Amino acid sequence: MIVENKKQLKEFIKSYKSEDSIVIPIPCDGNKHSVNTKLSTLYVQLLGGREFILPFNHSETLNIEIPNLKSDTKKYTYDRKKLNHFVKLDNVIDVNLLYYMATNKSLNIEEIDTNAHHFFNMRYYKRNNINTIIPVLKHLEKCREIAKILKDTVEKYAEHVKMTYNNEVLDNLSYIEQNGLQTTNGVVFSEYNLYTSTGRPSNRFGGTNFAALNKTDGSRKPYVSRFKNGVLVEMDFDGYHLRLIADKIGYKFPEGSVHEYMAKLYGVGYDEAKGLSFQYLYGLFLKR
């Protein structure tokens, strides 16, 4: 059902508040950061099978205002963090997180598209808000395919949900993202990705890797405080990963820099020792 009037909305709300559901947001412009675009439609599939499309910004529909969608039922979505930027709901479980906690891999559904999506994105690649002109039924086709993957994942890995990560970590990252980073040319937005092979979040968007800005070529200079006479303060742990491992195995480092200590063990300089430690941590083994 496409919800386009008060009667249909009332019917939807009644069903939505009585049953767990899959929730998939469709932004107006998928190429923009979620903070910089609006919600075009919201696809909701109840776990019993009923489907609803709520249109807010689409050329084919009678658009409605975003209703109050808070309820006690569970909502499963692919990206809770992204959903937070469009609409804040209670009891939302990130299915990508479920899968990652069980397999150390991320679900890959970004490439799921219909022929219509491919056509519009190639033909009108310069146009903003392309999702508002892609036919609603094609969005429905795409969402059904995504929903099937999400439901299968929930059935298989539901016990792997880590509520601290699901609630606190994802919501805090949403908050950090929506505040953006002040630069000399305005505010830019980043996007955190928890689902890396090492478990160390990455942070990039629009071709910029914010977690690895070069320290020597001036790449960091445009980033400034948003406050008058403000400053940016960077804090870092000395040998954080090495210290975590040492704590786990009961090893005690001496006072001082961990990397300087490891440099002496390796018989190399500080910078090389730091690089070697990370390589050993993440899969490089010494040749015998």
Locate the predicted segments by residue.
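Helical catalytic core of nucleic-acid polymerases
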Residues: 84-164, 169-179, 183, 209, ...
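Conserved DEDDh/DEDDy metal-dependent 3′-5′ exonuclease domain
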Residues: 2-10, 16-154, 239
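Acidic, glycine-rich two-metal-ion catalytic cores of nucleic acid-processing enzymes
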Residues: 2, 18, 24-50, 56-60, ...
